[in-house]
């Protein structure tokens, strides 16, 4: 991927964030991942306001639409919008819906009640199972065995 493409994506992302009252504090691209991963950290332009999960979700939709509507990127990508002020742990049903497709780290107990950890992309949480995409394969973890789920930084 060319430096020009990365620069154009940074500018487009910053403009989209500014239009909705946010500043981009960090922009990273993980081009070695398939699909490509774009990680954007934001903050409110108004320093008295905190960034919420809903803010991240809404801004993610706007930035995704802007990227899709441009001719800058012609390949699949994952977009992650976050803020330093948001907790890393997913606990509420709304969190699991909002961060579908995001990289997560899951701690759980296996059949022998030994704590294990896996990383992957969050697919969904049902009443009975947590579904994680790990290298293209769906891992299903019983909800009662899950210790914690937290947002993770994409890695290769």
From Swiss-Prot:
The keyword Membrane does not apply. It comes from Prochlorococcus marinus (strain NATL2A). This is Ribosome maturation factor RimP. Keywords: Cytoplasm, Ribosome biogenesis. It is found in: Cytoplasm. GO terms for biological process: ribosomal small subunit assembly; translation. The keyword Cytoplasm applies. It comes from the Bacteria. Belongs to the RimP family. Required for maturation of 30S ribosomal subunits. GO terms for cellular component: cytosol. SUPFAM superfamilies: YhbC-like, C-terminal domain, YhbC-like, N-terminal domain.
């Amino acid at each position: 991927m060319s430096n020009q493409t990365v620069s154009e994506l940074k500018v487009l992302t910053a403009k989209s964030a500014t239009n909705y009252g946010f500043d981009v504090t960090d922009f990273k691209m993980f081009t070695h991942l398939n699909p490509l991963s774009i990680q954007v950290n934001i903050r409110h332009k108004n320093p008295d306001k905190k960034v919420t999960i809903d803010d991240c979700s809404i801004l993610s939709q706007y930035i995704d639409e802007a990227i899709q509507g441009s001719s800058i990127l012609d390949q699949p990508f994952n977009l992650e919008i976050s803020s330093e002020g948001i907790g890393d742990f997913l606990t509420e049903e709304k969190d699991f819906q909002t961060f579908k497709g995001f990289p997560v780290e899951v701690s759980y107990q296996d059949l022998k009640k030994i704590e294990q950890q896996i990383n992957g992309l969050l697919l969904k949480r049902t009443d009975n199972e947590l579904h994680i995409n790990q290298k293209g394969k769906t891992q299903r973890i019983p909800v009662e065995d899950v210790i914690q789920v937290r947002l993770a930084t994409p890695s290769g």
